[in-house]
């Protein structure tokens, strides 16, 4: 292993019940089929594949108020939290292949149980910070951040399946990038808690270079700490990731997405990565599915050091001919 190589633990989370559309549970399968593990190994990373979690059906999972599938989502996240904690205890960077974005509850909880001073970068068209009481859809993939924030303790009712969750990050520990579809209740929460965000307006105004400079300065300025990148592929414009459940026009470009992941890699502090909401059933054509999957793979590889300028091994490529 070279000095740049990382120890990575990959866990698939084929789960879809945080939202209504079938197919997102196939995310781990299509990402693996695209050669993600082989491509990481080509970069001389030490990759351990922990396989895919298996989620049991939860009978009689009646809604809580309007929140759908609460027990299934709660239980799946508890399983994922345990798996991610195990990967972190083994000294590896956790790579979670989703699945819908409700799984960030488990991924970040498990990560924070081992690395408590976590910083979270959340790339998404949405803030995913509705509470079970502010949600208008009842879909838990729009609520994960509300379960994770200490400041919202007391604002979250006792949802069946979630008794294991302890809020593990503060409002000052998270930065959003790519926002462009935020509910009024979510906007109120983000503003009231003073959460740092770069909506597409700020990305347009500042450019992605400045956005990343400010993001990393804000999260790491006082001290270096582990970074958890939770990447919803709908953060990118639907022209690059069409096969996803809640696409919103006017998103991050492919180049901006890659720049975000390159900048995080360069800190040397990436400690956990979620690649979420790839849904192969929602591509209108096979090409749309391929485009989405290839983009998700490229974002992952850039997070682990694949650079657009090229990469080379630490050898002398110019040794004289024999």
Curated annotation (Swiss-Prot):
Q: Which residues carry this modification: Phosphoserine?
A: 7, 62, 163
Q: How does it assemble?
A: Homotrimer. Interacts with CMTM6.
Residues binding substrate: 126-130, 137-139, 183, 246, 277
Named from the GO MF annotations, one term is: arginase activity
Q: Which UniProt keywords apply?
A: Arginine metabolism, Cytoplasm, Hydrolase, Manganese, Metal-binding, Phosphoprotein, Urea cycle
InterPro entries with a match to the protein in the record: Arginase, Ureohydrolase, Ureohydrolase_dom_sf, Ureohydrolase_Mn_BS
**Would the keyword Metal-binding be found if you checked this record's keyword annotation?**
yes
Positions of post-translational N6-succinyllysine modification: 17
What family does the Swiss-Prot or TrEMBL record give for this protein?
A: Belongs to the arginase family.
List of residues binding Mn(2+) 2: 124, 126, 232, 234
PROSITE patterns in alphabetical order: ARGINASE_1, ARGINASE_2
**E.C. no:** 3.5.3.1
How is the cofactor bound, in the record's words?
Binds 2 manganese ions per subunit.
Q: Which GO terms describe its biological process?
A: arginine catabolic process to ornithine; urea cycle
GO CC annotations on file: cytosol; nucleus
| Biased composition range(s): Low complexity | 1-12
Q: Which residues bind Mn(2+) 1?
A: 101, 124, 128, 232
User: Which catalysed reactions does the entry list for this protein?
Assistant: L-arginine + H2O = urea + L-ornithine
According to its UniProt entry, this protein's organism is Oryctolagus cuniculus (Rabbit)
> Region Disordered: start and end of each range?
1-26
Tell me the cofactors it needs: Mn(2+)
Q: Which Pfam families match?
A: Arginase
Determine the domain of life of the protein's source.
Eukaryota
What is this protein's name?
Arginase-1
Q: Where in the cell is it found?
A: Cytoplasm
Q: Does the keyword Metal-binding apply?
A: yes
